[in-house]
Amino acid sequence: WVIKPFWSPIIDTVNTKRSWIIGMQLLIGCCLALIGLTIPLESFFKYTLVFFWLIAFSSATQDIAADGLYLLSLSSHDQAWYIGIRNTFYRLAIITGQGLIIIIVGYLTDLTGQIYLAWSLLFFSLSVTLFISAFYHYKVLPKTEQKRSNNSSQLFQEFYLILKSFFLKPSISISTVSY
């Protein structure tokens, strides 16, 4: 999430935001499934660490693409409604991530008698949820934008201009250092 200001120009210039959203959901789903597969291993920690890092990176990428897509696709009124819905689900995700997941794993542990199996089943279930979400978004997300040029010199120029405009904003150096 820290590198979003540097990563977002690439998302904006390479491929469509719709394809980034769907692709990142598929990648997160794959990572969750791989976490489920590696939990029973003795050296699960290093594998899950890599997959969680990929999930964090993919999540930030999807967030950038989703922000861009709703700005392109929705009217100002609909954008306000979308932000309200998005914030509601963000809060629900925090509650779910902090409590419901642990309750489910506890229930699965009681059911199976094996904590590793319970966590694996949970991550497989989350993976299926992301695959269903990706399929749903493939069907319903609007195709409102054109694919951008993959000309490397043009991409570099756009990236440079975006970064330059970011760092030329008033008080950006103070904000960056104090953060």
Predicted region positions:
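Juxtamembrane intracellular "pre-TM" segments in multi-pass secondary transporters
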Residues: K143-S175
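A membrane-interface helix-boundary motif in multi-pass transporters
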Residues: K17-I21, V105-V128
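C-terminal ends and interior cores of transmembrane alpha-helices
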Residues: P9, I21-F44
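Central cavity-lining transmembrane alpha-helices of secondary-active solute carriers
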Residues: W1-T13
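C-terminal membrane-cytosol helix-exit motif in multi-pass small-molecule transporters
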Residues: S127-K147
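Transmembrane alpha-helix termini and helix-breaking/packing motifs in multi-pass membrane transporters
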Residues: P9-D12, G36, P40, T96-L117
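Glycine-rich segments within core transmembrane alpha-helices of 12-TM secondary carriers
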Residues: W1-K4, A80-G106
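Intracellular juxtamembrane helix-capping segments at the cytosolic ends
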Residues: A60-S75
